[in-house]
Amino acid sequence: MKNEKINQLCVEVKAELEQNILPFWMQKMIDCEHGGFYGRITGKDVLEASASKGAILNARILWTFSAAYRLLHKEEYLETATRAKRYLIDHFYDTEFGGIYWELYCEGNPLDTKKQIYAIGFAIYGLSEYARATGDAEALDYACRLFEVIEKYSFDAEKNGYLEALTRDWRPIEDMRLSDKDENEKKTMNTHLHILEPYTNLYRVWKDERLKKQIVNLVNLFLEKILDTKTYHLNLFFEDDWTNKYQIVSYGHDIEASWLIHEAALVVGDLDLLKKVEPVIVKIAEAADDGLNPDVSMYYENFVCK
């Protein structure tokens, strides 16, 4: 009975993907005038063609259609993924200083040139998935370039971990926040999670020893610095020395981290690391259950103390 329900869910999810989600982006969001994809459409399907274009949106489109092509082998998915790859490299990539611009005008010129490490991580995620799906050398090359700039400019060799954001030319920046609701701290759980995720995917197509070392380091950072070992929820915001001043629970990030940490240990093939993380990720997943409602929806966050 359980397997039947899972199989039925798989059928429903695949249908939703192919009949609704992917066609939406291919039919409504391709910008034929300026290239790439439109940056905004309202909930009532009103296109805002002059809206700015964000790096995260473009990188996620790249990952999505690359993964769809890898699994479903449809040429239209490859065409859309290639469009996203081309636009990311030609417009979002900073040819002078390296890295990815945060935001572009609708025409494709830089609007906000800060280097948000979260966005660079998603660019690696999308490019590495395209390389995984197609064997494309250019996508892999740019993914590796982005790995190098994160390691050169964001990695804190003294106190460990990764800085949240920097200026275009990699100097300290006053406002490091990913969004207005976030705390303005130098290190965050969210960015570390979305460095771990793309680094893991990059390792699938680039068996580099330094990359592997940093993946293992990131997993250990989650276990030793980010995880609250009393509650098994993740702490969210930190000073550069890993001091945590907030008690905010993000249930969605808890469940996301539980499988991304496990996936990382599996992909690098470190059996000792796998034995270390497996009992912990179960406890993280169980802690995420605190946010479940009777209708199986989940609370967004719980501000225990801020």
Indicate residue ranges for each PLM-predicted region:
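Glycan-recognition and catalytic cores of secretory/periplasmic carbohydrate-active enzymes
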Residues: 1-306
